[in-house]
Amino acid sequence: LNPYILSDTRFTLGLERLKQVVHAGGHTTIGDMAVGLFDFERELVTTAKIFERADTPFRIEQVPHGAVVTHNRSFEETQAVLTDLSANSSHRLNFRARVKLFSDGAFFSQLAQLLPPGYLDGHVGEWLTAPEVLHEHILNFWRAGYQIHVHVTGDMGVEVALEGLAKAQAEHPRLLHGFTLEHMGYATPEQIERAKALGASVSANIYYLHELSGRYAELSVGYERASTMGRLKT
């Protein structure tokens, strides 16, 4: 589908519509949390073409996709690429020392990695990044002082991300590090306490609860887990 979905016409039109929606909503700053997900160079060029104009009344904080920028590069080479992106940032399109990493699979496709008892029908989730590779990436970016965001959807995905944070913090302690769990569909109370103790933040997708909890309670994970999607103290 990529040749159709990512055709120049559709890709450009999608960004133009995004621009209109953000403007209509009155937002002054938005984030692109996985720059390079489709095509790094193309995204940079097209994003600059659409948004680097006087009629763009908002800023975009751009966070690179960690697996993309590290692919076939040493970490030193990766840092050089990211430093160059930051140096060439503008008022509207801004790269900082931040990176987006990925733990387990998508929530809507039920590919989140779950702790026992897992899914009711017996299927298992998927890793977007093997745990040992994710830990390596976390440690490398942590040592270099980056703010790390990790896509996590299942409680096993959360566990792997927190273990990576704990190892990094034990080796090279940092304060106000900004390590953030993104989405966090399922998590245990103990994981929330551990995240707090490690200084992590959570950017939870609470829409999961409203959109999926009823159906997932019936078919996927049962009532107890479905009722605590996006576990927050509210």
Where are these regions (language model features)?
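Short amphipathic alpha-helices and their capping/turn segments at secondary-structure boundaries
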Residues: F75-R98, A187-G199
